[in-house]
Swiss-Prot record:
The lineage of its organism: Bacteria, Bacillati, Bacillota, Bacilli, Bacillales. It catalyses: 2'-deoxyadenosine + ATP = dAMP + ADP + H(+); 2'-deoxycytidine + a ribonucleoside 5'-triphosphate = dCMP + a ribonucleoside 5'-diphosphate + H(+). Disulfide bonds: none annotated. This is Deoxyadenosine/deoxycytidine kinase. Deoxyadenosine inhibits deoxycytidine phosphorylation and deoxycytidine inhibits deoxyadenosine phosphorylation. Deoxyadenosine/deoxycytidine kinase is inhibited by both dATP and dCTP. Optimum pH is around pH 8.6. At pH 8.0-9.6 more than 90% of maximal activity is still observed.
Length: 217
């Protein structure tokens, strides 16, 4: 295993749509670097299953819950001095999910305004620790849908294809304008963490390059 040049206090965040493989990369990368993980706790979310059954009723509750949980995670990461790989970014909540439901009318304008005001007060400040790099996982929609089906979460399988199509499009639009921190784009078709040990080494090299280039600015 060759030496990497990623600072031990780095914060690396993995972003991308549902089913794209964020958790797998987060765990594999953290193990390779000797970092801690910050994982999305799907099973303990009191609103998620209710949300999938009734978007309009539960979208605001769910987004406030996510915002609070992710902010607490950021605080933990900051207080620990970094050295974390994080599954999903706090930026996706407002840039993708809350905005999508506001646009579709499944979150009221008042709730959306309240949510975005809270997000900006908590996150978009100089005091908030932004990641050293955001890894954006992208891939063909059909491959992502196959992964969702193979994962077999009932609440995801009951969700319409049109929902996943719209989310896929919104993610692509969102990342094109994202500038809160440096971005590394990876296509899921280009690596296989489960069957190819060299895949993670190539990813580590790319992360080190992005962080190094940003430090020179």
């Amino acid at each position: 295993m060759k030496e990497h040049h990623i600072p031990k206090n780095s914060i690396i965040t993995v972003a991308g749509t549902v089913g794209v493989g964020k958790s797998t990369l987060t765990k594999t990368l953290a193990k390779r670097l000797g970092f801690k993980t910050s994982l999305e706790e799907v099973d303990h979310n009191p609103y998620l299953e209710k949300f999938y059954h009734d978007f309009e009723r539960w979208s605001f509750h769910l987004q406030i819950y996510f915002l609070a949980e992710r902010f607490k995670e950021q605080k933990t990461i900051f207080e620990a001095g970094g050295g974390f790989v994080q599954d999903r970014s706090i930026y996706e909540d407002t840039g993708i999910f809350a905005k999508m439901h506001a646009d579709k009318g499944t979150m009221s304008k008042v709730d959306y305004k309240t949510y975005t005001s809270l997000f900006e007060a908590m996150v978009m400040t100089p005091y908030f620790p932004h990641p050293d790099v955001l890894i954006y996982l992208e891939g063909d929609l059909e491959n992502i849908l196959n992964r969702i089906e193979q994962r077999g979460r009932e609440m995801e399988l009951q969700t319409s294809r049109s929902y996943w199509e719209e989310m896929h499009t919104r993610y692509e639009n969102w990342i094109s304008g994202f500038n809160a921190c440096p971005v590394l784009k990876l296509r899921i078709e280009d690596y296989d963490l489960l069957n190819d040990e060299n895949s993670i080494e190539n990813i580590v090299d790319q992360i080190a390059s992005v962080i190094h280039d940003n430090q020179k600015k």
